[in-house]
Amino acid sequence: MDQLAHHYRAHIAELNRRVAEILSREALSGLVIHSGQPHRMFLDDINYPFKANPHFKAWLPVLDNPNCWLVVNGRDKPQLIFYRPVDFWHKVSDVPDMFWTEYFDIKLLTKADKVAEFLPTDIANWAYLGEHLDVAEVLGFTSRNPDAVMSYLHYHRTTKTEYELECMRRANQIAVQGHLAAKNAFYNGASEFEIQQHYLSAVGQSENEVPYGNIIALNQNAAILHYTALEHQSPAKRLSFLIDAGASYFGYASDITRTYAFEKNRFDELITAMNKAQLELIDMMRPGVRYPDLHLATHAKVAQMLLDFDLATGDVQGLVDQGITSAFFPHGLGHMLGLQVHDVGGFSHDERGTHIAAPEAHPFLRCTRILAPNQVLTMEPGLYIIDTLLNELKQDSRGQQINWQTVDELRPFGGIRIEDNVIVHQDRNENMTRELGLTD
């Protein structure tokens, strides 16, 4: 924890600097950041799992306590209003006592509806950041999630501090252990549900603590991009395994994908080719490179694989231009990663929030930024046999370029995706996922 504590001082200083700058521009007194409130299930007395406001957890790793507030102005010591009710029904969060607490003036709130007593008196000139706009209105905030403030903060959140980078390394390190356990479970005959349990046990996190719902897909289920069904029975014939799963550390996410073949076969060779292509794409990352250009380069590599593995005929550029590669690789190459899995700022051209949309032919690309030092992105090329997309090719002349026999042979395997988490440095790329032990 010493290294985190060392970096945390500079992290808080940077957050304060950002706040002071945007407050000066917008003539605001400060920001009041709400951790959030519990959400009650309809007609029930049970709450949905609580997820803290990412703007809140950017400052400190309080992840599971609703009704907390931060009062920051970039100059004074940030104030943390920490919720500790008198409650014999539920576990009450302990008063924080970690390395980060010295940077906050901590006040204890026992009743959520009494928070106004702790807030600034000139509340009308402070901006509320959070989800519960009705609460903000009752409290007297006239500025609620102002666009200028949000755009500025989102743009700069893509540049990670050293503290944030260390948290993300640790999130990767944890997830790698889960992936290794899941891989072993797959080769030992486990079902999707059982593989999930092996993964969660290895990372030491519950389904509500990992940053997103794990994708644990055997055989043809790997063709479903966001498959989360978890079959309890093992398939009669074990062919392939795609796992897309991450872990959390102090509110920061990892997001890693691997694909395995149960036996050495043509599909296994396709995985090897995709792995090689993914590493080549990562080698192309550097400051000044446009992320959409990397996405287009991915389509060229997918086109070459379609030709090499007798899935299609023609030439590389023609397969890309006709949209044939998009039927096999329909999603974007990757996205910003940080406090959120699909982190904010991926389309922001500047501090004002100027939006740079994805190319018209590639609407699902989640990042159009120019790469810069200390950004963290996923790199996740894929190739799938998705019948709904391939059937569209059959409707016109493009279907004549597809080798449907090869498609039929590969369909039971579902698809391939390989995803690493990469830090862009000034003079190199840091592939956290591989460097921390997930080499294949």
Swiss-Prot record:
Mn(2+) 1 binds at D255, H335, E380, E419. GO terms for molecular function: aminopeptidase activity; metal ion binding; metalloexopeptidase activity; phosphoric triester hydrolase activity; proline dipeptidase activity. GO terms for cellular component: cytosol. The keyword Hydrolase applies. Its EC number is 3.4.13.9. Mn(2+) 2 binds at D244, D255, E419. It catalyses: Xaa-L-Pro dipeptide + H2O = an L-alpha-amino acid + L-proline. Binds 2 manganese ions per subunit. It comes from the Bacteria. Keywords: Dipeptidase, Hydrolase, Manganese, Metal-binding, Metalloprotease, Protease. It is an enzyme of class 3 (hydrolase). Its cofactor is Mn(2+). GO terms for biological process: proteolysis. InterPro entries: Creatin/AminoP/Spt16_N, Creatinase/aminopeptidase-like, PepQ_N, Pept_M24, Peptidase_M24B_aminopep-P_CS, X-Pro_dipept-like, X_Pro_dipept. Pfam families: PepQ_N, Peptidase_M24. PANTHER family: XAA-PRO AMINOPEPTIDASE 3, XAA-PRO DIPEPTIDASE. Belongs to the peptidase M24B family. Bacterial-type prolidase subfamily. Splits dipeptides with a prolyl residue in the C-terminal position. HAMAP family: X_Pro_dipeptid. This is Xaa-Pro dipeptidase. It comes from Shewanella baltica (strain OS223). The lineage of its organism: Bacteria, Pseudomonadati, Pseudomonadota, Gammaproteobacteria, Alteromonadales. The gene is pepQ.
